[in-house]
């Protein structure tokens, strides 16, 4: 089976994140099973136009918007047996350019995020996502990562029976994780791309209200300068930027509570990464998928809109010991192998051998 994966970025892109990691892990699993996998994405300065990694062939062309225009040519050249069209706000509309099966991968809907793009692009983007895409993909197979995201799709008119939930996996903790100096302080941590809809400002505010707490901000993004300015005079905040996997896990191992004040999450891979170390997460229930990745009161706290995020953080710190083992057991349920197996089963149902 030849599989074409369409996504606007890959994990080597400076703005790559959990959505890209998900698709790459699925592609790697398919390649391990003997399938031919092509990952088509945008070009960027840190990567060649063509490369191969872990059995997956990467093809890069186009930029932030023109990557969508390059997709039809990629479909024609590769002639895949099945296409996975990743909808990060808007899809590639691959179904218009091939008669082969197309699976639409949607991590979450972007209604709350489109306003950041400005009034014109925001309204156009939401129109394409909420009105046009459901019509083009009517009757197609959807894959999403949580019950919350499935509910959002159903609200847009997608039939519930067309939607398969394939949850995120998680990478194993590296065999060698460095030990960090124990300064005997309370360490709060946020692990995220630094963009407006992640609302890192609320994590900064929460940490500032807890005496002696340090907030470790792990991740990078174009909003970083704004966050650094906001953090001035608001407690002890350390910006680590993009870090290696071992160092990321060292920071998680030292953390007491993980803060995820994001406006919208399809699942929240960082929730499970923190749970691997027995670190509970505080997040907003309204963010969507975190209501599935966090077991409220057991592996973390789900805060309702209007509630005090800092107070929930303080309460979670007091209950951290009882939540730690629950979080570790919960994290053991998730693996990329299981994610890949379930996604492969969806594709197998659609592809008829030639």
Could you say what each language-model-derived stretch is?
Residues 121-142:
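Membrane-proximal helix-turn-helix segments that form the acceptor-binding/catalytic region
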Residues 225-246:
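Nucleotide-activated donor-binding/catalytic signature segment of Leloir-type glycosyltransferases, i.e.
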Residues 280-284:
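Short hydrophobic beta-strand element within catalytic cores of glycosyltransferases
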Residues 143, 177-210, 216:
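Conserved donor-binding/catalytic core segment of Leloir-type glycosyltransferases
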Residues 321-334:
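A short, well-ordered alpha-helix in the C-terminal region of glycosyltransferases
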Residues 285, 295-307, 314-319:
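Conserved acidic donor-binding segment of nucleotide-sugar-dependent glycosyltransferases
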């Amino acid at each position: 089976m030849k599989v074409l994966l369409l996504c606007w970025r890959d994990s080597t892109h400076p703005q790559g994140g959990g959505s890209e990691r998900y698709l790459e892990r699925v592609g790697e699993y398919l390649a391990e099973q003997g399938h031919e996998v092509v990952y088509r994405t945008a070009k960027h300065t840190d990567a060649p136009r063509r490369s191969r990694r872990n059995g997956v062939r990467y093809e890069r062309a186009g930029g932030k918007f023109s990557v969508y225009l390059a997709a039809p040519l990629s479909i024609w050249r590769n002639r895949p047996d099945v296409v996975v069209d990743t909808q990060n706000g808007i899809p590639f509309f691959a179904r218009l350019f091939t008669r082969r099966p197309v699976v639409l991968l949607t991590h979450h809907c972007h209604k709350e995020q489109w306003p950041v793009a400005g009034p014109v692009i925001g309204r156009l983007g939401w129109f394409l996502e909420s009105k046009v895409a459901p019509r083009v993909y009517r009757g197609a197979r959807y894959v999403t990562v949580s019950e919350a995201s499935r509910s959002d799709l159903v609200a847009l008119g997608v039939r519930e029976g067309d939607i398969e939930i394939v949850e995120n996996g998680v990478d194993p903790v590296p065999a060698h994780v460095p030990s960090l100096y124990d300064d005997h302080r309370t360490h709060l941590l946020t692990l995220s791309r630094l963009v407006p809809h992640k609302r890192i400002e609320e994590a900064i505010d929460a940490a500032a209200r807890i005496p002696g707490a340090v907030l470790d901000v792990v991740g990078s993004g174009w909003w970083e300068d704004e966050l650094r300015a906001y953090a001035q005079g608001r407690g002890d905040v350390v910006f680590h930027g993009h870090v290696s996997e071992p160092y990321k896990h060292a920071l998680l191992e030292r953390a007491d509570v993980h803060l995820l004040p994001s406006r919208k999450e399809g699942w929240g891979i960082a929730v499970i990464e923190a749970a691997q170390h027995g670190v509970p997460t505080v997040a907003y229930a309204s963010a969507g998928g975190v209501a599935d990745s966090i077991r409220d009161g057991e592996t973390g706290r789900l805060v309702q809109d209007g509630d005090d995020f800092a107070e929930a953080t303080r309460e979670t710190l007091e209950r951290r010991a009882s939540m730690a083992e629950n979080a570790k057991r919960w994290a053991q349920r998730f693996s990329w192998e299981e994610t890949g197996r379930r996604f492969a089963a969806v594709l197998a149902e659609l592809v008829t051998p030639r």
